[in-house]
Amino acid sequence: MVLIMRVSPPEHGLLYTANNIKLKLGDKVVGEGTVYIAQNTLSWQPTELAEGISIEWKQVSLHGISSNPRKCIYFMLDHKVEWNGVYGDPPQQAVNGRNGGGSEAEVDEGNGSDEHDEDDNFEDAVDEQFGEVTECWLMPEDIHTVDTMYSAMTTCQALHPDSANSDSEDSDPMQDAGGLEDEAMEEDDALTLGRNGVQNLSLDDDEERFEDADE
């Protein structure tokens, strides 16, 4: 769950807090504020807004250290954040819309090539995929604190494993192996297709996975 609310310091389980931390959502820098990295939530309260944001760890799809525009924390939420007056656009019509795409642009059946249609469908799928997530950056004034923030986030997220990836007694080992490969491909796609330096994201889990594969 992601809540837009007045954020107070957690009473229990606080691992890290710091002031002068900028939060960037998508292409927008929301402002500067205080971050609270706790066992159950990742929260940020801006200094110039009444409300902040509180995020349960299960909503964080991945996190790591980015170097663009400078060393900072990058993390991705598994859905689109709507923060009234701050971030998030209302749903837009039509997605085939380089020109605002109306129905007339989609009626050209039989005259266009199948290859062109497949390209359009792929681009629409990519747009839809990234429309369902929110890319976020925590940018501290002191970049030397990034490693400490990353360590605290890793510790907290490890306390909340994704239930969808948990082992099952009825699971098929071959299917499980395929699932791991699919997950790796999805993460690679996210790193490749992401914006604003996401391709520079360093994830320890990925590095260990590839090292194990080499062995």
UniProtKB/Swiss-Prot annotation:
GO terms (BP aspect): cell volume homeostasis; chloride transport; mRNA cis splicing, via spliceosome; spliceosomal snRNP assembly
Summary of the function given for this chain in its UniProt record: Involved in both the assembly of spliceosomal snRNPs and the methylation of Sm proteins. Chaperone that regulates the assembly of spliceosomal U1, U2, U4 and U5 small nuclear ribonucleoproteins (snRNPs), the building blocks of the spliceosome, and thereby plays an important role in the splicing of cellular pre-mRNAs. Most spliceosomal snRNPs contain a common set of Sm proteins SNRPB, SNRPD1, SNRPD2, SNRPD3, SNRPE, SNRPF and SNRPG that assemble in a heptameric protein ring on the Sm site of the small nuclear RNA to form the core snRNP (Sm core).
Gene (name only): icln
Acidic residues bias spans: 105-120, 167-190, 203-215
Domain of life: Eukaryota
Chief subcellular location: cytoplasm
Any single Pfam family the record assigns to this protein: Voldacs
Annotated segments matching region Disordered: 88-120, 160-215
Disulfide bonds, paired cysteine numbers: none
Name of the protein this chain belongs to: Methylosome subunit pICln
Family: Belongs to the pICln (TC 1.A.47) family.
UniProt keywords, alphabetically: Chaperone, Cytoplasm, Cytoskeleton, mRNA processing, mRNA splicing, Nucleus
Source organism of this protein record: Drosophila melanogaster (Fruit fly)
Species classification: Eukaryota, Metazoa, Ecdysozoa, Arthropoda, Hexapoda
Example of a GO cellular component annotation carried by this entry: methylosome
Assembly and oligomerization: Component of the methylosome, a 20S complex containing at least CLNS1A/pICln, PRMT5/SKB1 and WDR77/MEP50; may mediate SNRPD1 and SNRPD3 methylation. Forms a 6S pICln-Sm complex composed of CLNS1A/pICln, SNRPD1, SNRPD2, SNRPE, SNRPF and SNRPG; ring-like structure where CLNS1A/pICln mimics additional Sm proteins and which is unable to assemble into the core snRNP.
Subcellular localization(s) per the UniProt record: Cytoplasm, Cytosol; Nucleus; Cytoplasm, Cytoskeleton
Gene3D superfamilies: Pleckstrin-homology domain (PH domain)/Phosphotyrosine-binding domain (PTB)
